[in-house]
């Protein structure tokens, strides 16, 4: 027991994110050398050129070849290699090199959700639901920890159509993964990338480590996210030991799956290196994926966009018509910690669904309360306060008083200590040999649908206090009975934003709102490798095929599934049109018609919590108008973040003759980027911005009228106030003028702009930072 409890404690510590850095400081480090867009049609020629460049900083060509890890020669140009700082600096001075940066390590951001989003499979409609009508022509690439191919989620159905002719990818074999057996018309691609990881952390010993040198998944994260995005329809799923049973499927169950294993197990979590990530993007672009889902990132401070493999890969994917979706990270609820903030990808926050698992707590046969848990069978024992077993009543490993709590259920409070993570209290209870745990904490910071190593019922502070007071008054040692849990749907107000979901504003580009959208990310039940314990802990010997997971990692594939449906239904839409459809049709009110609440507090959400709102797949199918982003928007963005004309021409796939940072750009900020949201990062005097919309609705002749919710202290004027369309794909521009009417020394205020024609409501959130007090005083 001591061995795996130590691992349990380690899991708590790694939640705080291990500091990135060079593991071996006395040896060369892996660097990425980025050269821009790929206009060479010959991959061999590009690789030869990369080796030629690398040879400039080595004494021989052989040394250069041994140093190189990857040559990126499909979707973009560049390479990764083992270099010392002097060699890296020398390469950075070459004219054709845009950036050179160290390969950092990224971390993973780790059912009922699709019913909650309105995409039920079992319904009384005569027409098939969208996910059964669209998607078979779409390939979704999952960048994660691999795949468990035997899962029913990835089986080939008899009615599956042939693999799309546009597919250029392949299945790569390896340990316990045979492409002829494990790949089919559902799982059509599987690759794995290990060079960057092993150069950074050392060679994996696969004889001792449970990992696989193949696309096969051990950590479970990749299997879970793939199942969420595109899992086939699986009826009568038993769920997690009987909880959450029903029909399981992904958002686009007909879509094809391509797996890119970029992340590997280290210290009980998934780690992905930038060299490997960029190689996966390069292959995904070549292979012909339509959507990429990547649930990883790293905490701020964020690297510049073109010193980040994820952002570079996403940029070139978007230029080639591939939609990319990232998770925002699990560093909330503090503001300004949102990750993956590039404007050419979609960033997803996490929210709850309306499913709960109520668990009765009965003390002495009469005193009854209800908590939340995943307990499959009834548990009975004596009830005790934490003060009986832990110094000061603080449920932590180091506070144990070496008294055993045999057949005892312990009551712990998060506020004592405090106990930052519930896993701390669970590890302490296991060390004391407790039977179970009742954990009292703020309801806004509880994750009820978590798989526990020791049975744990979550209650709020009020209920915890009532239990404590009962104990204090009881003349005898109380007996308590808990469980089993039940599955209840539709009685919980939802959605609310997860407390851990990383919030805006963006620390890298505050004039682009991030996150973009919110999707389910708490208690998501999806496929799981049966050889992997549900908690990943060595002492956990349970085997399951479906597991609950929480995190923005889980919300990300929800959006990827919706993107696949939209791409299939509207094959002529660009990635920016798909993003726009998702954002402008999002909603901001919960099932009780109140504003969505922000977990971690009791306040209503603002755009920094939820972006444009909560995803609404059915509405996104027909948004009416979309905001398209074009090359000149990206050029404007790059000019404003400091890139030169020549660098921009190298990065953009099809540069126009006007691809240059003219002086006229000096007064245009990224607020003019044709984004579905509007952010003014510093409003002092009157400011006017421009947006352009395209008519993609079913009616070519239509008229849209504008409605405005003004931010506090800001006058908002829009011209024109009416948009008249006479054909499909017709574009119209409008201008928005912001003028402060009150004086603030620095405050964010929020509003929205909505265009409606009676059938469609095209909504854009507005964020304004008012900072006019000092400016007016100095004037």
UniProtKB/Swiss-Prot annotation:
Instruction: State whether keyword Ligase applies.
Output: no
UniProt domain Peptidase S8: residue ranges: 113-621
| Root EC class | hydrolase
Keyword Protease among UniProt keywords: yes
Tell where it localizes: Secreted
Gene source species:
Arabidopsis thaliana (Mouse-ear cress)
As recorded in UniProt, its EC number(s) are 3.4.21.-
Instruction: Report any one BP term from Gene Ontology.
Output: double fertilization forming a zygote and endosperm
Stretches assigned to the Inhibitor I9 domain: 30-109
Q: Which residues form the active site?
A: 144, 221, 553
Question: Per UniProt, what is the name of the gene that codes for the protein in this document?
Answer: SBT3.18
Q: Which InterPro entries match?
A: Peptidase_S8/S53_dom, Peptidase_S8/S53_dom_sf, Peptidase_S8_Ser-AS, Peptidase_S8_subtilisin-rel, Peptidases_S8_3, S8pro/Inhibitor_I9, S8pro/Inhibitor_I9_sf, SBT
Protein keywords: Autocatalytic cleavage, Glycoprotein, Hydrolase, Protease, Secreted, Serine protease, Signal, Zymogen
Q: Which Pfam families match?
A: fn3_6, Inhibitor_I9, Peptidase_S8
Q: Which residues form the propeptide?
A: 22-109
Q: Name one GO cellular component term.
A: extracellular region
**UniProt main location, coarse:** secreted
Q: Which family does it belong to?
A: Belongs to the peptidase S8 family.
Return the protein name: Subtilisin-like protease SBT3.18
Where is the signal peptide, in residue numbers? 1-21
Q: Which residues are glycosylated?
A: 84, 236, 406
From the Swiss-Prot or TrEMBL record, what is one GO molecular function term? serine-type endopeptidase activity
